[in-house]
Amino acid sequence: MAKGEGNLLAQNKKASHDYHIVETIEAGIVLTGTEIKSVRAARIQLKDGFAQIKNGEAWLMNVHIAPFEQGNIWNADPERTRKLLLKKREINHLANELKGTGMTLIPLKVYLKDGFAKILLGLAKGKHDYDKRESIKRREQDRDIKRVMKSINAR
């Protein structure tokens, strides 16, 4: 099974539109009991999320996990900072890549793997507006070519 192909719970669809994804890496997430119940119910939003390396540790920021409905007093803050579980070598590699290069770590997917919540992070560089327009133009051209080929083959 390829990375990010487990029981998919959430996906950041705008990531490939807004960023050039250079590299991906899988990490575990430290969650409380009510948070994992909300994640299993797919009540998580990755849209504005990002990850940072601070003091040799990886942290997930701005990812919204909705409060568990039956959690009452045990619910944590939906926007709290969550620790990511990575090996020291992976953290050092990411820290070197992020240092002064205009790169960022963004969450791409959240899924379950062997009962544990995993997140697929992308090492990404932001796209300019003209890059986005080129991507859209290329996609439309491919769609037009497929449409013409389909009409030719249908005859």
Curated annotation (Swiss-Prot):
It holds the Pfam family SmpB. InterPro entries: SmpB, SsrA-bd_prot, SsrA-bd_prot_CS. It comes from the Bacteria. One of its GO terms (cellular component) is cytosol. One of its GO terms (molecular function) is RNA binding. The keyword RNA-binding applies. GO terms for biological process: trans-translation. Belongs to the SmpB family. Required for rescue of stalled ribosomes mediated by trans-translation. Binds to transfer-messenger RNA (tmRNA), required for stable association of tmRNA with ribosomes. tmRNA and SmpB together mimic tRNA shape, replacing the anticodon stem-loop with SmpB. tmRNA is encoded by the ssrA gene; the 2 termini fold to resemble tRNA(Ala) and it encodes a 'tag peptide', a short internal open reading frame. During trans-translation Ala-aminoacylated tmRNA acts like a tRNA, entering the A-site of stalled ribosomes, displacing the stalled mRNA. HAMAP family: SmpB. This is SsrA-binding protein. It comes from Streptococcus uberis (strain ATCC BAA-854 / 0140J). The gene is smpB.
